[in-house]
């Protein structure tokens, strides 16, 4: 029986019941003591693949916990669900669509059938189209209206058309080729438009409009503003095609805008926005780093795909991360999860993960429309490196909530400065160590006495210096950030999110809450700008509309 047609009530499975009992037995488990008792714990609770090394030994688990979590994944049908996704079954049940972002990174010669058609031909045709335009721009064959070469590319898109490409193009800045700079215009905010365009020369700027329907409000408004900016700075209608290209499934709308059909790249219904950076949505990435590096990005993701499909669950990196998340969210009550990358180039990784995870698994009904039987979708947050240590890490160490964390760090920096990276790496390891070890009352008192404080002062200050410890974390290490390893890293978390969605029985590939916001936004706009519009449905919204109108009247 297909999981997406008849999802299981996971809380009724024997493996779920076994985990509930195990959780009670783990109430007083100490990671400190576990490491003392088992010198092989690190080796037993770590795994590597696709250029990534995962240490998950600093978790509230034993080998028995891992066995029970893996049993739950098997009993919930994760293996069958993964096969269904990769083979093109319509696992996005609410929209009756296949989910095939994984096809975008499969090699030429593979076959994936959708409605009787091998979509791999379309995938590699689009890659060839991308290669052509990247080559022309990098070889100075594509020129603007004044015959100058392209130096800047502005991607106009929002959500998945923005977050993934921005993450990758910034993470791979050391791989930038031919001096092409990428910029991103997403928000419908005049200030953002002003800040982006202020850096640009209209004669050497190319805009990419990324919108599946060519009708996304924020994207269309920014595209129209960019067009007006281009015309106002000396560009002509006749040569507009040299400065605007599109990634869309609505060819006619793009042609009507002034874009030549050969400069329109495809989008497909079987690729969701938050999983689309591997497609022509990734064109700004390819323009920045070149097609060879872009294909390495795809290859890294493909390597993780194969690991996910073939590796036993006991050593399957996406499955292990997913089930650890289930363990903390559903059995320990953790409501949020922190991601802490220790590299400046990964500073936007958390923003991409927020969409990937919360837009995917922020659901309260299962695939068949029935209410979920357990909590889903934790809050995803975090930030880059040592900055967080001087901000929110305090909450991780001494706060009352249990907040699991993933640390992500490369061994080698692209930009070595003195011993900076050694200190950065040391900070990363010491934070995960401090979360695990903490500081006992005895250790706090001994530390204060060693400073010569009176016993009264020792007793007064010691409670404040106690750090509970026993806080779980994973540490993901890679040699250095490269296109292949970054591709594997992103695919790792894509599959983690998918596995959790299967466990909860939800559809990780629709986003009806987002759609409601779009609908109401149009209604509120009309109520703000048209005095003959019906009033808002609630007094709060109407009051805020009236405040806006009053301010704009003078």
UniProtKB/Swiss-Prot annotation:
Cross-referenced Gene3D superfamilies: 1.10.1390.10, Glucose-6-phosphate isomerase like protein, domain 1
Localization in the cell: Cytoplasm
Any Pfam family the entry gives: PGI
UniProt catalytic activity: alpha-D-glucose 6-phosphate = beta-D-fructose 6-phosphate
Keyword hit for Lipid metabolism: no
Pathways involved: Carbohydrate biosynthesis; gluconeogenesis; Carbohydrate degradation; glycolysis; D-glyceraldehyde 3-phosphate and glycerone phosphate from D-glucose: step 2/4
One of the GO biological process terms: glucose 6-phosphate metabolic process
GO molecular function: carbohydrate derivative binding; glucose-6-phosphate isomerase activity; monosaccharide binding
DNA repair listed as a keyword: no
Enzyme Commission number(s): 5.3.1.9
Superkingdom of source: Bacteria
HAMAP family named in the record: G6P_isomerase
UniProt record similarity statement: Belongs to the GPI family.
Name of this chain's protein: Glucose-6-phosphate isomerase
Organism: Stutzerimonas stutzeri (strain A1501) (Pseudomonas stutzeri)
């Amino acid at each position: 029986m297909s999981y997406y047609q008849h999802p299981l009530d996971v809380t009724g499975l024997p493996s779920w019941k076994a985990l509930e009992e195990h959780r009670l037995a783990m109430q007083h488990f100490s990671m400190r003591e576990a490491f003392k008792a088992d010198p092989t714990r690190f080796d037993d609770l770590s795994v590597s693949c696709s250029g990534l090394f995962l240490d998950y030994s600093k978790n509230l688990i034993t080998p028995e916990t891992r066995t029970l979590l893996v049993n739950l994944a098997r009993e919930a049908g994760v293996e069958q669900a993964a096969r269904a996704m990769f083979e093109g079954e319509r696992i996005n049940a609410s929209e009756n669509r296949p989910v095939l972002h994984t096809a975008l990174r499969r090699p030429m010669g593979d076959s994936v059938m959708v409605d009787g058609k091998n979509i791999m031909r379309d995938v590699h045709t689009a890659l060839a189209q991308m290669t052509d335009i990247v080559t022309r721009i990098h070889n100075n064959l594509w020129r603007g209206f004044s015959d100058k070469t392209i130096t800047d590319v502005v991607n106009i898109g929002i959500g998945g058309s923005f977050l993934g490409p921005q993450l990758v193009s910034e993470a791979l800045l050391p791989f930038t080729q031919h001096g092409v700079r990428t910029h991103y215009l997403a928000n419908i905010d005049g200030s953002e438009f002003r800040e982006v365009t202020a850096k640009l020369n209209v004669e050497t700027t190319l805009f990419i409009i990324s919108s599946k329907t060519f009708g996304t409000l924020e994207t269309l408004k920014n595209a129209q503003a960019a067009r007006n900016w281009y015309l106002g700075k000396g560009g002509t209608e006749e040569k507009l095609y040299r400065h605007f290209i599109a990634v869309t499934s609505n060819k006619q709308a793009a042609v009507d805008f002034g874009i030549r059909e050969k400069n329109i790249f495809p989008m497909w219904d079987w690729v969701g926005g938050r999983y689309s950076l591997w497609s022509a949505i990734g064109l700004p990435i390819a323009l920045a780093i070149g097609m060879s590096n872009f294909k390495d990005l795809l290859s890294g993701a493909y390597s993780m795909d194969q690991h996910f499909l073939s590796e036993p669950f006991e050593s399957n990196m996406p499955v292990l991360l997913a089930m650890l998340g289930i363990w903390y969210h559903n059995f320990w009550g953790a409501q949020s999860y922190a991601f802490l990358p220790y590299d400046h180039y990964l500073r936007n990784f958390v923003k991409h993960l927020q969409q990937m995870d919360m837009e995917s698994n922020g659901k309260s009904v299962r695939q068949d429309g029935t209410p979920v039987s357990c909590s889903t979708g934790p809050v995803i947050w975090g930030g880059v490196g040592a900055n967080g240590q001087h901000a929110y890490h305090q909450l991780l160490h001494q706060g009352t909530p249990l907040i699991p964390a993933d640390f992500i760090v490369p061994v080698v920096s692209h930009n070595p400065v003195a011993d900076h990276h050694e200190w950065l790496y040391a900070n990363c390891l010491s934070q995960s160590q401090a979360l695990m070890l903490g500081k006992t009352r005895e250790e706090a008192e001994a530390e204060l006495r060693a400073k010569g404080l009176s016993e009264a002062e020792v007793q007064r200050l010691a409670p404040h210096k106690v750090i509970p410890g026993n806080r779980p974390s994973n540490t993901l290490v890679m040699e250095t950030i490269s296109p292949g390893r970054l591709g594997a890293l992103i695919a790792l978390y894509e599959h983690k999110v998918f596995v959790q969605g299967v466990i909860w029985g939800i559809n990780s590939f629709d986003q009806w809450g987002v759609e409601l916001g779009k609908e109401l936004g149009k209604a509120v706009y009309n109520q703000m700008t048209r005095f003959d519009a019906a009033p808002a449905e609630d007094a709060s919204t109407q009051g805020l509309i009236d405040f806006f109108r009053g301010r704009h009247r003078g």
